[in-house]
Design a protein with these regions (language model features):
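Periodic small-residue-enriched repeat registers in elongated scaffold domains
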Residues: 1-286
């Protein structure tokens, strides 16, 4: 059937289209043009210039797609490659899955370069470079680094995760670099120790274990379990120190608190500044 089709292996079939070749045993090309199956049990349903080159690989359609991993599948689209074991590219264009059991749903120029059980749902130029059980739901130019386990980027752009169990919800250019760190959104925020959290804002840093920044601009929570609610240019640098809001406030001893205001400093242990400007509480429990 069809025109210039070839079935060259046992129980193979090229049943429609033109210039198709079923070269693997028990392989099938149903239609389309210039499609080729080379592995045992390979299937190409249609489309053009598609290749199923490993055992039980499948290409459903589209143009210039390649399923080269054992049990791999490409649903459609253009120039997609599924080369990992049981890997899948559902659609889109120029997507590549090299890792085992990896899945790319669609989008453009997304890559899972190695690792196991990783997913990129869609988006543009997202990359998983070798983690395991990690997910990029969408967005643009997001990256999960190699050796990472079970981390997630939900969306946004230019995010980087390089630690296990880390999460970035969205925003732009956020970095979660330690295990169990979380950035919900915002721009250019960095969560760089275990269990750190940044909810949003711009250029905020949580750099000690269990430190939290709620939002604001250029705030730094660098003490263990320290907290900054918001404001600008505030620093909570010791364990359990708290700055609720304001600008240019400093809580620089354990359990020190600044509730708000401008350029206030709580430098004594258990000290507190309620608000105002240029106030200093330097004594213990002052």
């Amino acid at each position: 059937l069809g025109v210039c089709n070839t079935a060259s292996a046992y129980f193979s079939a090229a049943v429609g289209g033109r210039l198709n070749a079923a070269n693997g045993g028990d392989s099938t090309v149903s239609g389309g043009y210039n499609n080729t199956t080379n592995g045992t049990g390979g299937v190409i349903a249609g489309g053009g210039i598609n290749i199923a080159s490993n055992n039980y690989a499948t290409v459903s359609g589209g143009l210039s797609n390649t399923a080269s991993g054992q049990y791999s599948a490409v649903g459609g689209g253009c120039c997609n490659t599924a080369s990992g074991y049981i890997s899948t590219v559902s659609g889109g264009c120029c997507n590549i899955v090299n890792g085992s059991r990896g899945v790319i749903g669609g989008g453009l120029c997304n890559t899972i370069s190695s690792g196991n059980n990783n997913t990129i749902s869609g988006g543009y130029c997202n990359c998983n470079s070798g983690s395991s059980a990690s997910t990029i739901s969408g967005g643009t130019i997001n990256s999960i680094n190699s050796t990472v386990l079970a981390s997630t980027i939900s969306g946004g752009r230019c995010h980087t995760i390089c630690a296990n169990f880390a999460t970035i919800g969205g925003g732009d250019s956020n970095t979660a670099s330690f295990a169990y760190s979380t950035i919900s959104g915002g721009v250019s925020n960095t969560a760089s120790q275990y269990f750190t959290t940044i909810s949003g804002g711009y250029n905020n840093t949580a750099s000690q274990n269990s430190a939290t920044v709620g939002g604001g601009v250029s705030n730094t929570a660098s003490g263990g379990s320290s907290f900054i609610g918001g404001g600008r240019y505030n620093t909570a640098s010791c364990n359990y120190s708290i700055i609720s809001a304001g600008k240019c406030n400093i809580a620089s001893n354990n359990y020190a608190t600044v509730s708000g205001g401008l350029s206030n400093t709580a430098s004594g242990q258990y000290s507190a500044v309620g608000g105002g400007a240029l106030n200093t509480a330097s004594g213990c429990s002052s």
